[in-house]
Amino acid sequence: IHDAQENHPKKAIKFIVPPNCYGGTNDQARRVAACIENVEVVDLPVDGDNEMVQSIETILAKIAAEDAIPYIIAEIPTNPRVEVPDLIQLKNALSTVRKTKTGDIAIDPVFILDQTFCPNVLFLGADDLLSSVRTLSYASGSKFPSGGKCTAGYVVGNKKSEALMGKIELHLQLCDNEATALQYEILASQLPSMNQRIQDAYQNTRDFVNFIKDTLPSAKLNFVSEDLAAQGFTPSVFSLDLPTKGTTDQERETHKRALNLKLINLMISEIPNESKFCVSYGQSQGCYWTIPATSTQGTTKEGDKDYIVRVSLSPTMDLELHKKVFLEFVASI
């Protein structure tokens, strides 16, 4: 916003954000927009019947016509459906030169990519997919980058977004929000082994997902395909839509929510040292259960919350015990 106000004074600024985008990202975007007159949040539908690239195409065309400034915040893979868009189509949608109503060239978008789920995938290098698009990539550090040892994350810009990085640095310092010396030390020591932790946690997750498919085939699971995993998208989080019953939508939803809590309460009571019930992408140990699977932050509208279970696994956990307890749950329903 600071950069836009300096380079394009008085122009409208649009933050394009999935309404169910996770946690603080969604919350902060809406709080900032509420404070500044020419800043507005535009919903980016990426879930259900909506597809990220198509939604971006539609919204960017509209914003270009208005001669406004587009900042897109998105997660790849998405939350909570763990989907990856067609990346070539995404690049094309972000690279298209658009025109304003008066025929001038519209301001190109900045793609702000939350890579917390898959920080191992390279998007920004000279030969990588988004090298030609103004892109910022950021990741929460609490799970993989720091090995669960601190909460500091990081943001990286490509060549096209270098000008924005200076402003980000300035604001981190203004807000006294830069990582501490100790956090830098932790990240420096942990990052070299990050990719191995990601792989180990993915293997546990794939194993657990396959087990659930076998033991409760009527459940709907959202996780990356084997093909996407082969491309490097190896998250360690999946969402679980439990089978429900009832004659009305309300009855089915109520029954499903009760089942969600039954499953989670069984897990945390049977495996108290590893299974945790909280809003988290997890740490380097144990297994984290979140409901609703979308943001629980106060600014997220109730209708955008998805009451399915989000499960986040780690590289070090007793997977066989989790399978055993899940089997108990299946037997009980």
Predicted segment positions?
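Phosphate-/polyanion-interacting regions in eukaryotic proteins
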Residues: 1-20, 32-34, 87, 95-102, ...
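Conserved PLP-enzyme active-site core in the AAT-like
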Residues: 2-213
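Conserved beta-strand positions
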Residues: 74, 113, 240, 311-313
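Active-site C-terminal subdomain of aminotransferase-like
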Residues: 136-304, 313-318, 325, 332-333
